[in-house]
């Protein structure tokens, strides 16, 4: 976003009562960009995490840099968006299984980091709710710090989150009904 456009967006938001934003980081380029925005605008906050759709063979190298963002004078407000996405998998079962395994390993590594940082966590879960819950349970993170972003599951899954102390957020997807 060019500065004039960003300024206009911030002004329009302010005029209707929106006074702060959280930019959700999904890959290394986002983290750097959003941290810079957050440094320039006191009402813009950011998160850092590797989104499951960006998990590739080099995910370990990317993820190892995330905790360093918390050592910065302007740290993220949450770890995420992290999670599992089983929606767009290849038809080839072997390739599909490789992607799922990589996403699961990456999620577990990031949950361990988030637990060590004792920070809030934003979860991306698409066609993978049960696995996400299982890995969060296994990680031992505080469920009260977990929010399932862009929640698209049913009432039973929402009750499951609430039972554990987790939360769900609803975005434009709530209008799809």
Residue locations for each model-derived region?
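Mid-domain alpha/beta scaffold segments of enzyme catalytic cores
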Residues: 1-177
């Amino acid at each position: 976003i060019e500065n004039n456009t960003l300024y206009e967006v911030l002004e329009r938001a302010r005029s209707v009562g929106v006074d702060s934003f959280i930019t959700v980081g999904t890959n290394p380029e986002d983290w750097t960009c959003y941290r810079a925005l957050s440094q320039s605008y006191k009402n813009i906050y950011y998160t850092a995490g590797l989104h499951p759709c960006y998990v590739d063979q080099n995910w370990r190298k990317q993820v190892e840099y995330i905790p360093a963002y918390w050592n910065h004078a302007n740290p993220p407000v949450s770890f995420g968006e992290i999670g599992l996405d089983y929606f767009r998998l290849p038809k080839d079962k072997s390739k599909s299984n490789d992607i799922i395994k990589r996403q699961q390993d990456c999620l577990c590594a990031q949950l361990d980091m988030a637990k060590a940082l004792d920070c809030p966590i934003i979860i991306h879960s698409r066609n993978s709710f049960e696995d996400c819950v299982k890995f969060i349970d296994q990680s031992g993170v505080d469920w009260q710090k977990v929010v399932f972003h862009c929640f698209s599951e049913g009432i039973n899954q929402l009750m499951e989150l609430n039972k554990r102390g987790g939360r769900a957020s609803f975005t434009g997807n709530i209008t799809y009904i």
